Amino acid sequence: NQFLIMRFNFSEVSSNVNEVELSFKLHCCSKLKDFVFKYEDLLGKEIWDVLDEKIQEEPGAFLSAINSYATRKKNIRIYLLIDEYDNFTNTILSTYGTEFYRKATHGEGFIRGFFNVIKSATTGTGAALERLFITGVSPVTMDDVTSGFNIGTNITTDPWFNDLVGFSEKELREMLTYYKEQGVLIQSVDETVVMMKPNYDNYCFSRSRLVDCMFNSDMVLYLSLIH
């Protein structure tokens, strides 16, 4: 409870080149408005005084206004999360080619502009936007907006974070033991682990942790399908 959470999920943005920019704006502005409504009691109703209708229609201006207001309050800390940051850009690149992709991520592209605002929002003493965590499939899009957003660190292959996502075998066995005790699991825990290992236990994100593969935390939950 140290931070107010500002959350985006770019998988919700349309990858149709005729709709993508508007879809991106609508998604970001909707999430920013949700953020203000959710934390209105902490931010103070006065925040709406700095968020006129025009600002609420432009993601960069909206984010900048929230950050400036929260920074002036001095006791607000914001953690920004972006899930699947490259979802729609990867689709554009693979479907429409580099021309449309570059329009979004280079020069005055709307994605590049948004990341420029994020970078700017984190600068300065006491900036409310303190931390960022961004996930995606590949670093391609991030590389293309990097000159604007050059404050991030790629932790994908850092050994320290190898088990950040997924279940270790120990965690899996604990979960399966619980379901076995509840009468949900027909097979023994050992039998289930043996069956799951070849299919769901091959996730490793660091070369130095090759013996610490993780189980896919989504797939191992479909216990009813392995009866």
Regions found by a protein language model. Name each.
Residues S11-N16, D86-N87, S138-D143:
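Conserved nucleotide-binding/hydrolysis micro-motifs of P-loop NTPases
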Residues A65-T71, Y101-L129:
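Substrate-engagement module of ASCE P-loop NTPases
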Residues I226-H227:
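Conserved small/polar residues in nucleotide/adenosyl-binding loops
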Residues N75-Y101:
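Conserved P-loop NTPase "ATPase switch" module shared by AAA+ and STAND
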Residues N1-F37:
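P-loop NTPase motor core
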Residues V50-I66:
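Short glycine-rich substrate-engagement loop in P-loop NTPases that contacts/grips substrate
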Residues P139-G148, I155-L223:
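Amphipathic alpha-helical segments of the small helical/lid subdomains adjacent to P-loop NTPase cores
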Residues L81-D83, G113, E130-V137:
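Structural recognition of the conserved hydrophobic beta-strand(s) that form the central parallel beta-sheet
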